[in-house]
A protein has these predicted regions:
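Short coil/loop linkers at secondary-structure junctions
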Residues: 67, 108, 123, 248-249, ...
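Short, charged/small-residue-rich alpha-helical element at the C-terminal edge
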Residues: 226-299, 306
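ABC transporter nucleotide-binding domain
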Residues: 172-262
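Generic structural signal for secondary-structure transition and capping sites
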Residues: 32, 87, 152, 183, ...
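ABC transporter nucleotide-binding domains
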Residues: 2-7, 12-188, 193-207, 211-213
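Alpha-helix N-cap/helix-start and coil->helix boundary motif
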Residues: 11, 95, 119, 193, ...
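Short, Lys/Arg-enriched, disordered terminal segments
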Residues: 1-5, 302-306
Length: 306
C-alpha cells in the first residue's frame, strides 16, 4: 500500500523543552488514522507541523514520498485541515466563505462549494451569515471547507466538537465515505474514543510528545477481546478464590475493586457461585468486550484524554 504521510524523527522544542520528540508516523493512502493522546501530549503540535503552521526543530515530513519544506505550497494545496477551532468571516454566508477559500487555494469550482455544503448537511442554510451559526454548524462548515478542494490528505483536530449524537453519526458516515469511496486519507484526533473506534483503520498513541505505538484496529480487537469484569470490595479475597479455588491464572487486577478475567472456560453463574461461597462481595459481574478505550487506558496509565 502507498504511504501517504511519513514523519522521521519529527521533533519540536519550545523554550528548551521538547513538545514533540522523535515521532515516526506512517499513514497509508486511503486509511483513517486515529491520533490519540492525553491533553498536552503533542497531537496538535504534530498536526501543525504537518500542515506547515509550525516549523519542526528537527526531523522530516514526507508527503507521498516527497520531502516537505517551508516552501512546499503546492504540496499543502493537496491537504485539507481543521486545526483547533475553525475561524470564518462571520458576516459572510457559508457559501461565500467557501468560495473565498477556493479562491485563496486557487481552486475555482463553484460546484465544489455546493457539494461540500451538501455533504455536511448545510446546503439549506448556505446563505445565513456565519455569525448566526451554532458551534456544531461552524464545525460542519470547517469540514466542508477542508474537503471542498478534494484533498488527498484530510487532517482533522477534534472534528466532532459541539455536535449532537445525530450530527456525530452523520459525520462518521462522511469520514467513511471519503476514505472508502474517494480514496482520501484521513488523520483524525478526538477525545471520543468510541467514535474513533468505529471509523479508524489504524491508531497512533502519543504521550508526552513521543509516539508510543501504531497499531491496527483489527489487532486491538483481537487482543483478549472478551473478558469478565468483576467489581468487588474484596479484591484480595477474590484473587484467592480465582487462583486457588478455581485454578484460574489469566486475570488482571485493574484497580482496587476491579478485576478482569480472560478465561473463556468459566461461566458467569459458576464464577458467581464460587465467589459467594468464598465470602467475596460481588457488586457487579458481567461479560465485556475489549474496547479502544481499554487499550488506550492501558497505554497511557489512566491520565485520561482530551
Amino acid at each position: 500500500m502507498v504511504t501517504a504521510l511519513q514523519t522521521r524523527n519529527l521533533t519540536k522544542v519550545y523554550q528548551g523543552k521538547e513538545a514533540v520528540s522523535d515521532v515516526n508516523m506512517t499513514i497509508k493512502q486511503g486509511e483513517i488514522y486515529g491520533f490519540l493522546g492525553p491533553n498536552g501530549a503533542g497531537k496538535t503540535t504534530v498536526m501543525r507541523m504537518i500542515t506547515n503552521l509550525v516549523k519542526p526543530t528537527s526531523g522530516e515530513i514526507e508527503f507521498f514520498g516527497e520531502k516537505m519544506t517551508p516552501g512546499s505550497y503546492e504540496m499543502l494545496k493537496r491537504m485539507g485541515c481543521i486545526i483547533e477551532y475553525p475561524v470564518f468571516y462571520d458576516k459572510l454566508s457559508a457559501r461565500e466563505n467557501l468560495m473565498l477559500h477556493g479562491e485563496y487555494m486557487g481552486y475555482y469550482d463553484p460546484q465544489s462549494a455546493t457539494a461540500a455544503l451538501e455533504l455536511v448537511k448545510l446546503s439549506d442554510i448556505n446563505n445565513k451569515p456565519v455569525k448566526q451559526f451554532s458551534l456544531g454548524m461552524k464545525q460542519r462548515l470547517g469540514i466542508a471547507r477542508a474537503v471542498m478542494t478534494k484533498p488527498e490528505l484530510l487532517i482533522l483536530d477534534e472534528p466532532i466538537n459541539g455536535l449532537d449524537p445525530v450530527g456525530i453519526k452523520e459525520l462518521r458516515d462522511v469520514f467513511r465515505m471519503l476514505s472508502r469511496e474517494y480514496g482520501m486519507t484521513l488523520l483524525i484526533s478526538s477525545h471520543l474514543l468510541g467514535e474513533i473506534e468505529q471509523v479508524a483503520d489504524t491508531i497512533g498513541v502519543i504521550r508526552e510528545g513521543r509516539l508510543m505505538e501504531e497499531v491496527s484496529m483489527e489487532s486491538i480487537r483481537g487482543r483478549n477481546s472478551h473478558y469478565i469484569e468483576l467489581v468487588t470490595p474484596d479484591s484480595t479475597k477474590a484473587v484467592y478464590v480465582l487462583s486457588h479455588q478455581l485454578g484460574l491464572n489469566n486475570f488482571k487486577v485493574m484497580d482496587p475493586g476491579l478485576i478482569r478475567i480472560y478465561d473463556d472456560g468459566i461461566t458467569l453463574s459458576d464464577l458467581n457461585k464460587a465467589l459467594v461461597l468464598g465470602d467475596v462481595g460481588v457488586e457487579n459481574l458481567s461479560r465485556k468486550h475489549h474496547s479502544l478505550e481499554d487499550y488506550f487506558m492501558e497505554r497511557i496509565g489512566g491520565e485520561g484524554i482530551a
